[in-house]
């Protein structure tokens, strides 16, 4: 399923002329890494469940006993079957523009879900995944908000348009603090999320041109719009 999720959007982009064939090269890089990680976790789980020697049995007993009283030890007995793989070395990742926000939502990481509020209606960040790219903007300035809306408008004729989720005054409300906690994002931050729910890039206070440049390889209409504006 993860293989399919990784490949589906890339195939769609290439087949619909939104990206060059080279985008498909990242599939092998990312999923070979994931396979190696899964094999390593599988070996770890097997050795934990069926210790091959006395040393492994001793370690397992110690971990099980400590896990009852120390939560930090519990990860040792977690086979990681419920957590997605990160793509830390993906060639698609952009340079991290907000390293101070912490590792949880860095480029290459699965974008954490967070519950937001649209008035009385709950909205989850993950509801926007699965089709186009998503820009998550946290309390953007008025000028940046206008620029991001313009970017989204420039992609409306694309097969899978860009979506902008604005959080803060006039937008969605981080009433439960989950976005702030899980993304480490402060006012002015912008996070760019791939269609498969992985973080492509993030910035603490970007210029609109930075965001436009990040999206241009996936939305030719954005590049065309920028060229037309420059000629005007």
Feature map (PLM): residue ranges:
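A conserved FAD-binding loop/helix module that cradles the flavin
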Residues: 1-3
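Active-site-adjacent scaffolding segments
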Residues: 5, 9-15
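Helical substrate-recognition/capping region of FAD-dependent monooxygenase/halogenase enzymes
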Residues: 13-232
């Amino acid at each position: 399923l993860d293989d399919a999720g990784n490949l589906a959007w890339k195939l769609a982009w290439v087949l619909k002329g939104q990206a060059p064939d080279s985008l498909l090269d990242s599939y092998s890089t990312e999923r070979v890494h994931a396979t190696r990680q899964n094999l390593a976790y599988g070996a770890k789980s097997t050795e934990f469940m069926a210790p091959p020697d006395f040393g492994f049995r001793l370690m397992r007993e110690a971990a099980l006993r400590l896990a009852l009283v120390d939560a930090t030890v519990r990860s040792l007995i977690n086979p990681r079957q419920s957590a997605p793989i990160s793509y830390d070395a993906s060639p698609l990742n952009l340079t991290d523009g907000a390293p101070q926000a912490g590792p949880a939502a860095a480029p290459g990481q699965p974008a954490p879900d967070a519950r937001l509020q649209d008035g009385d209606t709950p909205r989850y960040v993950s509801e926007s995944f699965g089709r186009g790219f998503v820009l998550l903007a946290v309390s953007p300035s008025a000028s940046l908000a206008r620029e991001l809306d313009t970017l989204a408008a420039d992609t409306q004729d694309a097969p899978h348009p860009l979506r902008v989720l604005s959080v803060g005054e006039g937008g969605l409300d981080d009433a439960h603090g989950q976005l702030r906690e899980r993304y480490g994002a402060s006012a002015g931050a912008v996070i760019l999320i791939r269609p498969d729910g992985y973080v492509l890039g993030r910035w603490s206070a970007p210029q609109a041109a930075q965001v436009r440049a990040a999206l241009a390889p996936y939305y030719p209409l954005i590049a065309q719009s920028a060229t037309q504006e420059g000629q005007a």
